[in-house]
């Protein structure tokens, strides 16, 4: 693997193709998007558990993109090019992780952790206190050797929910590009 970073594009919906400048796109690494994210045409992988979005992305994705879906949904599209079944997430079984029941961004994050990387960057990640934040923190705790980077928008503030986690950093896009150039590419 030439680039040791996996970037997740979450469910927030604020990160549009015009925000993906050349420098950022060269440093983003493997891109996994949640469902029909605005950047699905640029993605290496699309993770979806929404039947309508699955139908759309299977028919409209870029040629290089692989679509990942839960087994029940995957079975309907098995003959399409570049669609795969999401893996069995052994590390998440004790949490009763269900690929059909979680959000698409959580499915994308679980997939990134399953693929494995020393650094996983979260762009456009929707933080929501009832379901998303507990799931996100649980996954981050299961993978303590993975550095998670929560990439803030240019005018966004840091959030305090990750203060107790040593493997989480909150940085902006400029800091992300600098960090990638300085450290990640050298791994």
Model-based region annotation:
Residues 1-187:
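Metal-ion/cofactor- or nucleotide/acyl-coenzyme-handling active-site neighborhoods
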């Amino acid at each position: 693997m030439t680039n040791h970073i996996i970037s997740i594009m979450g469910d927030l919906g604020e990160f549009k193709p015009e925000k993906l400048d050349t420098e950022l796109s060269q440093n983003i690494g493997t891109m996994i998007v949640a469902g029909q994210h605005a950047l699905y045409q640029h993605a290496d992988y699309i993770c979806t558990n929404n039947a309508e979005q699955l139908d759309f992305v299977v028919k409209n994705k870029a040629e290089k993109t692989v679509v990942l879906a839960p087994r029940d949904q995957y079975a309907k599209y098995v003959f399409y090019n570049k669609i795969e079944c999401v893996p069995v997430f052994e590390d998440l079984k004790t949490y009763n992780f269900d690929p059909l029941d979680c959000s698409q961004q959580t499915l994308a994050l679980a997939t990134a952790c399953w693929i494995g990387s020393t650094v996983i960057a979260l762009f456009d990640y929707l933080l929501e206190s009832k379901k998303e934040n507990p799931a996100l923190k649980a996954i981050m705790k299961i993978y303590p050797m993975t550095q998670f980077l929560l990439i803030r928008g240019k005018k966004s503030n840091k959030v305090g929910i990750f203060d107790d986690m040593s493997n989480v950093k909150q940085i902006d896009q400029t800091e992300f590009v600098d960090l990638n150039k300085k450290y990640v590419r050298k791994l």
